[in-house]
């Protein structure tokens, strides 16, 4: 899988996406991740990529020209399944969406910045707008990093244990059940006996019951009638 991220602050996410599991995925050739400095595609003497909005609105707006140039250039190199814009206006990013996007081959993620982007970019260049929550960040870099991490860990071979991703919280719209490791008892705090029993069917039943209970208690909005 290849993900191209367009940003004015590549250094903000470079270290985050070059370490741990995502870094190893790149080293093993399972994920190709490219960060593109949008300012490199500006023809302005000062490499500006924003300007004042028409109509007297406050703030600055990302210009259409440099964004069009870089997306057009990238599309001459390969076909892209989606051109994503990180925006609080977009559809909410969740685990099913991460699953869906992980099955694709090539993605472009455009990081929003300033007051917003020239609306023509949304009309003619963007195929999907995605939000990671109902709040506003300084820019879309953190949102792009969150989405990339969530998507990349689902690529076959990225995690040593594929079952780990399949049992994550939000798969099947349930929170994950409690997990424990050694020692079995610490300061009087015991691991549930069922997990030490070795009875796989009973353990699976317990885990499902715990997942349902935790979801009802902590995220009742996930429970469908």
Swiss-Prot record:
Cysteines engaged in disulfide bonds, as pairs: none
UniProt GO BP: tRNA N1-guanine methylation
UniProt xrefs under Pfam families: tRNA_m1G_MT
CDD domains: TrmD-like (cd18080)
Keyword tags: Cytoplasm, Methyltransferase, S-adenosyl-L-methionine, Transferase, tRNA processing
Enzyme class at the top of the EC tree: transferase
Entry binding sites for S-adenosyl-L-methionine: 112, 132-137
Enzyme Commission no: 2.1.1.228
GO molecular function: tRNA (guanine(37)-N1)-methyltransferase activity
PANTHER family with a match to the protein in the record: TRNA (GUANINE-N(1)-)-METHYLTRANSFERASE (PTHR46417:SF1)
Family: Belongs to the RNA methyltransferase TrmD family.
Quaternary structure note: Homodimer.
Name the UniProt record assigns to this protein: tRNA (guanine-N(1)-)-methyltransferase
